Amino acid sequence: MTDFDPPLRLYLDGSALVSNWRALDERSGAARAGAAVKANAYGLGAREVVVRLRDAGCRDFFVAHWAEAEAIADLIPPGWISVLNGIAPSDISGVRALGAVPVLNTPEQLVLWRNTGGGRCHVMFDSGINRLGLSLQQISGGALAGLDVDLLLSHLASADTDVGQNNQQLQLFSQIISATTAQRFSLCNSAGIMLGADYHFDLTRPGLSLYGGIARGGMGAFIRPVVALSARLLQVRNVPAGAQVGYNATYTCPNATRVGTISIGYADGYLRAFSGTGQAWSGDKLVPVIGRVSMDLVTLDLNAAPELQEGDWIDVEYDLAATASVTGLSQYELLTNLGSRFARIWR
């Protein structure tokens, strides 16, 4: 197969990734920090992320699906991998062969695990988000009897904001601890780490902020960006004042404009929310997005950078917090939507 050079690049900063994990581990106090690497490490590439964090000292990795666990199981001891979405009867033979640890979420999963041999497991407790997990009544009623529960975990619903729900979940989680024989306890995501030591317990589970996301105010002081986007300039054309650009003629050139078309679009995760709001750069010169983002292409106003020519590379602005504010997309969406057509280049 021919090794073509993709016309769009995703640059990934491995030293920033490790720096972010170490900063979050330090701020976890007596707890140690794991890493959420589900959804292909939020779109960056799970294998590359796991190797770097493993070498930095991380020993707890969280994925959502069993296929995600299998994809990294040759890189670390399988017992370091936790699978958040539980088990189904069709999973059992593969689960046993793989050796990763299930997070059990329902009474039916508890029964299935017991009846198929038991062994080390984790359990999700629902402290108020009402997604996955067992209730206070179920755990207090003895649902975990006879199980070898290593980690009891729960998930904060609103840790990125200062609301009473955070303390309510903390109190409920603290209450359930005495009702279990679990060896370890975990409540915090990236934002939760910043709520203070009371929330840390034994293990924290950062995700977004590993990859450069600012999960809570103040984290910008120590979280470094990991992701940078670049796209090739495919064509430059001179467009007269009054001419319209892009689908549905949403942009009219106010004056004569050098319009550049770059190789990126919503098929790559650069969504239509960037239409008329996105920014790109040639060095320190702003070349803003004009017109509507299409599937494979974006148009830019190149008037500020007359030296640009076909074949040049353009840096596409992708600061997660700032871009989320402008587009209305979450930082999570901005990361996980990044498509497979990027050449992912670690440096």
Please provide the spans of the model-predicted regions.
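Active-site-proximal beta-alpha core segment in soluble small-molecule metabolic enzymes
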Residues: 3-4, 8-19, 26-176, 181-186, ...
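Active-site anion/phosphate-binding pocket segments in diverse small-molecule metabolic enzymes
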Residues: 2-14, 18-21, 68, 87-89, ...
